[in-house]
Amino acid sequence: MIKESDWNERYHRPRRRRRRRGCLTRLVTTVLVLGLLVGWLWWQQNGLSSETITVSSAPDGFNGYRIAVVSDLHAKEFGEGNQVLLDYVRDLEPDLVAVVGDILHEPDQMSMIPAVAKGLAAIAPTYYVTGNHEWAAGVVRELEPLLEQCGVTVLSNEYVMLERNGDRIALLGAEDSNGYADQKTVQELADQVRQEQGEVYEILLSHRNNHYEQYAQARVDLTLAGHAHGGLIRLPGTDGLVGPKRELFPQYTAGLYDLSYGQMVVSRGLGNQFPCFRLLNRPDVPLVVLG
């Protein structure tokens, strides 16, 4: 005869085992989900991305000309010496690299400049303009000569002429508006190009996306900009959640835009001044292909 205590033990033991297995399953599932979430969030902050943007208004001689736009690095390092970033840019096979400001934001970050500057210059001719943070950090006078020593061409309210297959493009570079009060304006720079070179296709490197009206008024054909960080959190159907001035739902934060005159390509950027959270907005190196 089975004692009642033995019967209860035999009856309840499988139930306890099932409960333990259920708790273990829930624990493992929770750990896996959290691990995947952490990994995905890390990838959102550090996984490089690129969009190929075709601009069809350039001269025929520049068909297929490739420009990699590097913006808002903010001294962020993708691998030691930014080697991951350099390898990524190299794989894009650019004919030109445009660095459109905010490469750093603190004076003590100057030590990271040589590695990334020399690396980019070794990939393709590299041109640089300042952003607001280089001026705010008070490093422009030291930074620009250092970049030149590393093989990068600094365009300080200046322009250079590019030639390819018998056609010409003027590449203009505007200092950020945080610069000197009496510095040349975009309009004045564009007027200088037309006086000296006649009517040519113009590409402007300028940090601030929100100065798009100035670029259109100056009748620049194509502007390459950054500054907006893609709106940080890119909600579906929006141009991002937060703008550079902490405004909600900013405009012109990523991709190609038709202005009242000309076009503008805006990079979502690579880093941030503060530990900001990116969502659906991975670090960005857009590739502009002239068609």
Regions from the PLM with identified roles:
Residues 25-42:
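Hydrophobic membrane-insertion alpha-helices, especially the h-region
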Residues 37-55:
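Aromatic-capped interface at the extracytoplasmic side
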Residues 74, 104, 133-134, 159-160, ...:
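Catalytic metal-binding/acid-base residues of hydrolase active sites
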